[in-house]
């Protein structure tokens, strides 16, 4: 019972201290000449919709396809096909592929 009262008393003190603190000073930027500051474009980021964000991602990085950025889209819905060869007619067999580090069968022999 004493631990509960101590916890409640501590939370009450914490709430009173938080209420009494007056933080009216502005937050300053800690960067050189105001360039590259963290959070300098927070207003613009909150105004952008999701389509704008997707277009910026598609434009900036070349290894993400635009189809991957579309909403509710599976790159290849055909079973057994890889994402890279989805439109080809032949079926990919994952057990007949070559051995490499990415397929976790590659052994690092010294």
Curated annotation (Swiss-Prot):
GO terms for molecular function: hormone activity. Proteolytically cleaved, probably by S1P, a subtilisin-like serine protease (subtilase). Disulfide bonds join 76-86, 99-105. One of its GO terms (cellular component) is apoplast. Belongs to the plant rapid alkalinization factor (RALF) family. This is Protein RALF-like 4. Residues 24-58 form a propeptide. Pfam families: RALF. It comes from the Eukaryota. The record marks 54-55 as: Required for proteolytic cleavage. The gene is RALFL4. Residues 1-23 form the signal peptide. The keyword Thylakoid does not apply. GO terms for biological process: calcium-mediated signaling; cell-cell signaling; regulation of pollen tube growth. Keywords: Disulfide bond, Hormone, Secreted, Signal. It is found in: Secreted. Cell signaling peptide that may regulate plant stress, growth, and development. Mediates a rapid alkalinization of extracellular space by mediating a transient increase in the cytoplasmic Ca(2+) concentration leading to a calcium-dependent signaling events through a cell surface receptor and a concomitant activation of some intracellular mitogen-activated protein kinases. The keyword rRNA-binding does not apply. It comes from Arabidopsis thaliana.
